[in-house]
């Protein structure tokens, strides 16, 4: 599994702010570290968030709700979540309006990380896969058990 580092998220934030406007800078370093670490917590040797989708939802939710940055928390939370999914082979299909609605819902407190996870799962893209025995099969990247 590919993880985004704190440095990568800060660089992504700086790039977003430069391109879309707003203030650059971290408001609370501890809250940023917490948001980045939360998806990878374990308890009793088991991941609290075992699937890639669960980790992505928790990452996006944590950055948005922790208000780690001076500005652009919704933008970077969304961007980090989507990049994390893409880096780990999960593709989504959605409109900008759908994405906007779920992110505003999370930011306002109307939706939690479970609702965000549900949204991610409902927007996963099904892919065609060519198997070893030269037959075509279809699979969804959803690996929640």
Say what each PLM segment does.
Residues 1-145:
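FIC/Doc superfamily catalytic core
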